[in-house]
Amino acid sequence: MKRVKWFVTAVAMGTLLFGCKTKEQTAETPPPEQPKAEATAAPKAEPPAAAAAQPEATASAPAPAPRSGYDRALLRAALLKDKAPDTFQVKFTTTRGDFVVTVHRAWAPIGADRFYNLVKHRFYDNASFFRVVPAFIVQFGISAYPPVSAAWEKADIQDEPVTQSNKRGYVTYAKTSMPNTRSTQIFINLADNAGLDRQGFSPFGVVDAQGMKVVDMLYDQYASNSGPDQDQISKLGKPYLDKGWPKLDSIKTATLIGLAAAKPQ
């Protein structure tokens, strides 16, 4: 069984579970709760009509069209180890609009390098935002394609020191309760979640305030305890989500922009 990406703190301090249920966990694991004391309330999502007011992430050429397949290089996870630029940007074109993640390699070099390679080979194209907990986090990063998910199942990277706090808009890897289990799953903080800093969640990038207007609009009305099973997303891909959770928003494309996009691929 694939390892569900989540985080746990002691019950006495308030439990935070990061991930979705698997069949084995449904009877004993309570649904994830948004933090009460440590996280500030995030602004409510603006109505969909506000999407028209979203800023363009860049004035350059339009985003590439979504691919119907995947880059075969993604099947060789161990070979994708290019070093990321010191700073680079990734444009996410989604079913709600566009937002840009600015990555600072100095914050978390290992995580930044992994993200750079994933985006360079279009790993996140067509993937869904499968877990959205209001005023807490937005989680994504399971491939839309089962062969790709299988190739990255054990491609974990080492943990890194937390150099930045998990503030609203900051982007961080999901992981299990075990050390060194970061892989491809990402979350965006919807609030200031400083409690995650102590658990070793090290941000590597940030979405600016304008981009967060789009992130705030991602569909969040599926209850946390009735959301999709991560194992099944990995095994069955996007059709599993489209059938059971058709209102989930998804990523059309996630591409490097600016100087990073101009580097040889």
Task: Locate the predicted segments by residue.
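Sec-dependent N-terminal signal peptides
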Residues: 1-25
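Cyclophilin-like peptidyl-prolyl cis-trans isomerases
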Residues: 20-265
